[in-house]
Regions:
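Hydrophobic, membrane-embedded alpha-helices of multi-pass small-molecule transporters
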Residues: 25-41, 179-191, 208-209, 224, ...
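Membrane-embedded alpha-helical modules
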Residues: 111-230, 337, 342-450
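N-terminal signal-anchor module of multipass membrane proteins
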Residues: 1-95, 103-111
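Intrinsically disordered, low-complexity non-transmembrane regions of multi-pass membrane transporters
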Residues: 1-29, 230-242, 278-285, 293, ...
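Short, non-helical or kinked segments that cap or interrupt transmembrane helices
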Residues: 67-68, 89-103, 143-152, 205-211, ...
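Membrane-embedded helical hairpins/re-entrant loop segments and their flanking transmembrane helices
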Residues: 50-91, 259-330, 456-457
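Juxtamembrane interface elements at the cytosolic ends of transmembrane helices
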Residues: 5-12, 40-46, 50, 190-200, ...
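Short juxtamembrane and helix-loop transition motifs at transmembrane-helix boundaries
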Residues: 22-29, 51-64, 80-90, 110-119, ...
């Protein structure tokens, strides 16, 4: 009986069954859609990080910058395969595409500027272990992170990234011609094309909006003479991932900051996985799927820290494709992951992406950061906006954004590690504020608050 069932399972060629085995010919078009939807987003975090470090004492070489893009491809492929085909219950066994996450950029940048790239990956290694532990205990701790709390974190991440995008649109740090009209023109051309494709395009045009926007901006940049191909010419055609490409360092303040980010983003992963199962399978994820998915994310981040890849997350644009097409056959996603992996072996690809002017990157990423911000607002609004919740969210954002804007001078009398944790990024302080206030402040619904006010009037 078992053999018969196995045979029937192997002959199932449906695109709409997770365990089916559709033909390569039928699977490839959907797999390419997923690839186009994530490929640019997967390369941009490494470009942004190396760009932010470019004019500091910890600037990375052009060769290492190319390698970071490659490593991001390796890690995205590894994380996706883990989620598709779990190993020892590490993985969700769900149809998802993983990619390098923008959510960590503010913290990664602040750590890199202060301590260098080795500290970035040292802190990430510890954070990945923390995420794995969170996954093991997700059933017990999830209740402490309602949408209001996780939404405030996501909103703060989006707000903190705007200055990065706008700086890039102006030409980038260290550019003697920063602010030139050419940079702003190319940036807004990229933004306009991206918006038009996203708002008016359909099918593959809509899915590849950012890629098309960058392509048009890139061609315009070549015309204006602000693209340099030296790095592309010098890059090799093939290379293998390197083990420990950077010496890992573990500054305590960097580790604390990164650990907080991993805890919060692990909780956020619950929402990402829920979106996948709701859109493609019309159900909520099981406890085992949530646990396995978060543990896989943690393990992928640990592996990433050892080969130079940044932390990963589920890509919402790929979740959107699942919801739209209802294609959930894991083979389709495995083909996408395989293509991502192949790209990771080709330095020319990374060098080509690195040759994209910062103005073009800024024009493309401003839309991504705006979407992150609005996603946070939607999460917050999914909870009741009672006076209690409004107060908690408002204080979290005010303190988080306010302290960072003031900089070190606001906490000049505090220890250095304390200043690093709370002034490097608004995300950490905002997270702690909303988390603690949500536990401490008595929970009241809008109806209960109205009843209290009515009782006061009656007196």
């Amino acid at each position: 009986m078992g053999k018969k069932e196995k045979k029937e399972k192997n002959t199932n060629t449906s695109l709409f069954d997770m365990d089916a085995n559709p033909s390569f010919k039928r699977s490839l078009p959907i797999a390419l859609q997923h690839l186009l939807a994530m490929i640019v987003g997967n390369t941009l975090p490494a470009i942004v990080l190396t760009g932010q470090l470019a004019n500091t004492e910890f600037a990375v070489s052009a060769q290492d910058a190319v390698y970071l893009i490659q490593a991001g491809m390796f890690v995205a492929a590894i994380a996706t395969f883990l989620q598709l085909y779990p190993v020892f219950k590490v993985g969700a066994k769900l149809p998802v595409i993983m990619g390098v996450s923008f959510a960590y950029i503010p913290v990664l940048t602040s750590i890199g500027i202060k301590y260098g790239i080795g500290a970035v990956y040292g802190a990430q290694l510890v954070g990945g272990v923390i995420a794995f532990i969170v996954g093991m205990n997700i059933k017990r701790i999830y209740k402490f992170f309602p949408p209001m709390v996780s939404g405030t974190v996501v909103l703060t991440i989006g707000l903190s990234l705007y200055s990065v995008a706008l700086n890039y649109m102006a030409g980038g740090n260290g550019n003697p011609n920063q602010g030139d009209l050419v940079y702003w023109g190319v940036a807004f051309l990229t933004l306009a094309v991206t918006l038009c494709c996203n708002m008016f395009g359909k099918g593959i045009i809509k899915l590849a909006a950012i890629l098309i926007g960058i392509g048009v901006g890139y061609v315009a940049s070549i015309f204006f003479g602000i693209v340099h191909f030296d790095g592309v010419k010098e890059a090799a055609w093939l290379t293998l991932p390197r083990i420990m490409p950077f010496k890992l360092e573990f500054p305590i303040d960097a580790v604390i900051t990164m650990s907080v980010m991993f805890v919060v983003n692990s909780i956020q992963a619950v929402g990402d996985l829920s979106s996948t199962t709701a859109g493609g399978l019309n159900r909520v994820p099981t406890a085992d799927e949530l646990e396995g998915g978060i543990k896989a994310n943690g393990l992928a981040s640990v592996i990433g820290s050892l080969i130079g890849g940044m932390p990963t997350a589920t890509y919402s644009q790929n979740v959107g494709i699942v919801s739209l097409t209802k294609v959930v056959a894991r083979k389709v996603f495995a083909i996408t992951a395989s293509l991502i992996l192949v790209a990771g072996f080709i330095p020319k690809f990374g060098a080509l992406m690195l040759s994209v002017p910062q103005a073009v990157i800024g024009g493309a990423t401003i839309t991504v950061f705006a979407q992150i911000t609005m996603s946070g607002m939607k999460l917050i609004m999914s909870d009741e906006m009672s006076s209690r919740n409004v107060t908690i969210v408002g204080l979290g954002i005010a303190l988080g954004m306010g302290i960072v804007q003031l900089g070190d001078q606001a906490l000049s009398r505090f220890p250095e590690w304390f200043r690093m944790v709370f002034t490097s990024s608004p995300v950490v302080l905002a997270t702690l504020v909303v988390f603690l206030l949500n536990i401490i402040m008595p929970k009241k619904t809008i109806a209960e608050e109205e009843a209290e006010r009515k009782a006061m009037d009656d007196k």
